Amino acid sequence: AITLGSATTIPAEMFAGCTSITTVTIPKSIETIGTSAFDGCSKLATLTLGTGVTTLGDRAFADCGLTALALPDNVTTLGDGAFSNNPNIATLQFGAGLTAISDNAFATNNAIESLTIPKTIATIGAGSFANWSKLTKLTISGNTLTSIGSKAFENAALLADVYAEPTTAPAVQADSFSGAGTSVQGSKTFHVASVEAYSSWT
């Protein structure tokens, strides 16, 4: 068992590489989880984040074995690669306080088939959802999203349908969807508010 006492921060790399850890419950007293704090905890399957958490450092839970993830509403800062290479995450819930998805935040997933970007998100970073092998449907909600980074959905080979609700097309890079939909007959389909508004996507 791990007891954190009255601490408000879990230091960088504190539990990195601890392959015996299977379950982690972060108490509400913790506000910040440092860089690579649980990086490489390959058997960590169950994570409960306390409502006090506001900041997750770079690669905080990278290379773990998580099966589900729910971000509390107080989380406002998500470090680069915070949950990268957690291929078994089957359910992903974004908190209401998150406005930006960092680079490589959730890269590599082999379980989720449908992803909805909530209306609170303004930017999607480079490589943030790259290598999602089962993703078939992407929904971008609301009117807040302004940009999608390079290779954000790279190699989502089964991505057949992208539903984009914003009336103004978010800025995309030439490779934001590189390799996406390549295994779909007829390739992927963009369902958008206006063909003219989204001309930059084609």
Kindly label every feature range from the protein language model:
Residues 1-9, 19-32, 42-55, 64-77, ...:
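Structural signature of tandem-repeat unit edges
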Residues 11-14, 34-39, 57-60, 79-82, ...:
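Consensus positions within tandem repeat domains that build extended binding/scaffold surfaces
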Residues 37, 60, 82, 105, ...:
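Generic detector of bulky aromatic hydrophobic side chains
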Residues 174-181, 197-202:
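Short, aromatic/basic amphipathic alpha-helical patches
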